[in-house]
């Protein structure tokens, strides 16, 4: 084997020596608490400065039926002075003051109904947050149109005027026509074929079959509604109505409600029929649909309120179900009295917690594969708010611009992705979903890097994205008239980029050019192994010229499949450290963080700390790790040095 001689200049040598000896360097972030599955302390932390885009007040929930809270916000703790804000009988643990707050110190307290007030907590405001504050939900509700359709489109004539040669239009009609020929699905499952399986196998197959019930019903309705809006052909109306009325007969406590995704899709499918064909349905048909939709919508509200807002992560809720609930309640508004309360909750929780698996820096802690399941939620909800109120969350929240860099560094055009979290090892290139996402974000943010990325993706993967349903109707009906950014972009990508809020970073010799790029992807997540986040803190993957050369192994078939729980979920499947054969804990508490980033034109250095990833009070495990710090050094064009302490 030929050995490469390393010729490093004197000053580079001093830098490297200083880095590894721990000389004082710029430090990233601040100390962080260990996250549990549920919020245990108030937010903002008592006595702290507001660090979010606008003040968001939360407190630990009290479990039980009919729990509610009173909350009071003041400038002092005196009993005889009027409150700035007082809310009573809140059924959940979120308060966003949708009012301008001057710089200074604020005091607040809460009480559970029937109990005493908490002590006062305080937080300080040192910046002007007024421009960031979303509109009050009451203002948003007041702007919801009275008529129908509201959801897929609000101007039928506009949809009929779309060019017949438009590829999205052609794809939708073609897919709808194929479904016209299929028999209607039902909500039963033949369990006799499970006779020779064990209980785990039966449960897995039964859930997969139950998911298909809602999926098939929704898929038909969704495409039939779209095809009708595009063509005006009543054959799509009759089929959509037939499917929607059939779903009203399905028992929510049966197979159609066994899996939350299926349950939510049944709910939204019926709502789409009600909304799209409102003027064509009889009063009896409308009532039948409304009654069935309410059963499922009420169930979800009771399930999530006073729970999911203080939970570190509820994956299905944030991936699709919040979006489905938001859409359904937009349709039901002014038809069902409770939707005012329900929609206010979903509005509040979106603006209090989103993006739930990231932050201002961008990135996504559940990785590349599962980010695709959040794309439509992250785009469609703020788009509706902007359309109704003018409030532009895409411009307010830095996440939306910073995700462009995350795409370049972690889902690189023409190359393999970073490989972290469930199913990301399957991603050998960005594919149609990421192309579609970049195009929409380019239009909505007018940030040129998104256009650059989309163009690069098409250069390496000239796909017909019309065949991918993700964001297709959004693109066709809501942003078709929006221009792409026109500003010229001078590309000067740094050697390293960290997305601390999203749990990943990357060092690359030639980012954006896969044919000559050496990339090392770094993992340091603020949430430990939970959901689709794996026990891979302080691990790394390496690619060269867009191909994997040193990567973790494994795959996921199901959350509980033996290969995942015995291999791919665990540290031993990644380029990490085992302690006497033990990897990192499977717990939200097994966190890691980036501590330093130093870079120039000839080197890049990153330090990350996973000292807390090997113990958890939740799992009652402690593998005795006092310190696990990993140092990464990239010396272009093709030298990587990794040093552990």
Predicted regions and their residues:
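Extended polysaccharide-engagement surfaces of secreted carbohydrate-active enzymes
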Residues: 365, 370-645
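Recognizes extended acidic, P/S/T-rich segments that occur
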Residues: 70-103
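Bacterial Sec-dependent N-terminal signal peptides
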Residues: 1-32
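Aromatic-lined, polymer-binding surfaces characteristic
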Residues: 150, 172-173, 206-413
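Pro/Thr/Ser/Gly-rich low-complexity, intrinsically disordered linker/stalk tracts
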Residues: 32-62
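Low-complexity, Pro/Ser/Thr- and charge-rich linker/hinge segments at domain boundaries
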Residues: 33-41, 124-153
